[in-house]
A protein has these predicted regions:
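Structural signature of outer-membrane beta-barrel domains
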Residues: 44, 92, 119, 168, ...
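Short, flexible loop/turn elements at secondary-structure junctions
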Residues: 3-5, 16, 102, 182-184, ...
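Transmembrane beta-barrel wall of Gram-negative outer-membrane proteins
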Residues: 175-273, 298-317
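Acidic, small-polar-rich N-terminal luminal/periplasmic segments of exported/outer-membrane proteins
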Residues: 30-173
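Cleavable N-terminal targeting peptides that direct proteins into the secretory/outer-membrane pathway or into
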Residues: 1-30
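Extracytoplasmic loops and strand-loop junctions of Gram-negative outer membrane beta-barrel proteins
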Residues: 125-127, 145-146, 174-177, 212-216, ...
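Long, low-complexity, polar and repeat-rich extracellular regions
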Residues: 16, 27-28, 32, 203-205, ...
Length: 338
């Protein structure tokens, strides 16, 4: 009887503890519950509640991005309903398909935007689709994916999928994050981000990453290397705000289209490109101009994107919002079977 009484007391104690924990968890969940606001698909990017949007839009915030752990920008789009993604030849040059729109490759029905401005208007150019010109890191606050709806009017005439990446912004409290990532294929990556207040009503966010790797399929040299640095400055005004951001990216990775692997004497985990076979010289134009090509440079994005916006509110509900974006050099090399 004593044994049974002890078990009953233990059961009561456990039940009480679980009930208390459940109550605390419910209270915390209630405190953390916030309404999702979307800006994609609205005139001038004016935020509305997601529940009030009359079109299909997906929100993925920074915490969800960490959980999904995408291997590339295009890989993140797998979380969007109605979107199918394949990596094709590597981190760059993915194929992105949108439900209801026919396509044979690349990403003809995808537009990638940053802070509401399209990064690059051409949806496909020699395997150089939109996601090849953008890298995800800890400076991203959220990604919004708008399928159809007002896309043709409020995007760059895109009837399919428009994805909008919004950068983190500074606040009154200074905070930061440092992250180191490694893998069984010798990936070495360091991410960092810091945000805070410079002076009254002037806020900053800076961050980026540095990485290197011989690749999942060992190339015999550092075939995947890159870095990125982002600055975002926001000035709050009495009747609006000013925002400016710039992002410098130099990130390239090996790009292999399908090659024979199930062949005697060939190691599928190692590429035969090596350091001696990756050099080539090609001749173009009527004057046979020579170009030295190094396949080790891979495919990627070498350049920078800068942009900004001004938002002003006036009497009687009038608003003025303007955005700008500029981008520069793209260089890319890859090995294609043929």
């Amino acid at each position: 009887m004593k044994f049974n009484k002890a078990k009953s007391m233990l059961a009561c104690a456990i039940t009480l503890a679980l009930s208390t924990h459940a109550a605390v968890a419910a209270e915390q969940a209630k405190e953390k519950k916030v309404e999702r606001i979307v800006v994609s698909g609205t005139p001038a990017g004016v935020g509305i509640r997601k529940i009030d949007a009359s079109y299909a839009v997906t929100n993925i915030d920074s915490s969800q991005i960490i959980k999904l752990s995408p291997k590339s920008t295009a890989d993140l789009f797998k979380a969007v309903p109605g979107v199918w993604v394949e990596s094709s030849g590597g981190e760059s040059g993915a194929n992105v398909f949108v439900r209801g729109f026919p396509g044979g490759g690349d990403a003809p029905f995808l537009t990638l935007s940053i802070e509401g401005s399209p990064v690059y208007p051409a949806p496909t150019l020699s395997f150089l689709e939109n996601s090849s010109l953008f890298r995800i890191d800890e400076t991203i606050e959220t990604m919004e994916a708008l399928r159809g709806g007002p896309n043709p009017v409020l995007s760059n005439g895109q009837p399919g999928l428009t994805t909008n990446f919004r950068l983190k912004r500074g606040g009154e409290d200074t905070q930061g994050l440092f992250k180191y990532t490694t893998s069984d294929y010798d990936l070495q990556r360091v991410d960092a981000v810091v945000s805070g207040e410079i002076t009254d009503d002037l806020y900053f966010m800076v961050g980026g990453y540095v990485k290197s790797s011989p690749g999942i399929r060992d190339a015999g040299f550092t075939s995947e290397k890159g870095s990125q640095f982002t600055i975002n400055i926001t000035k709050e005004l009495d009747n609006g705000e000013l925002n400016f951001y710039t992002r410098q990216t130099d990130d390239h990775g090996a790009w292999y289209l399908p090659t024979p692997l199930n062949v005697n004497g060939i190691d599928a985990e190692y590429t035969q490109l090596g350091t001696l076979n990756r050099q080539a010289t090609i001749f173009t134009g009527p004057n046979a101009q020579a170009h030295d090509i190094d396949l080790g440079d891979g495919r990627g994005w070498d350049g920078h994107v800068s942009g900004g916006s001004i938002k002003l509110e006036f009497d009687n509900g009038w608003q003025f919002i303007d955005r700008l974006l500029v981008y520069f050099l793209v260089s890319t090399f890859g090995m294609q079977s043929g």
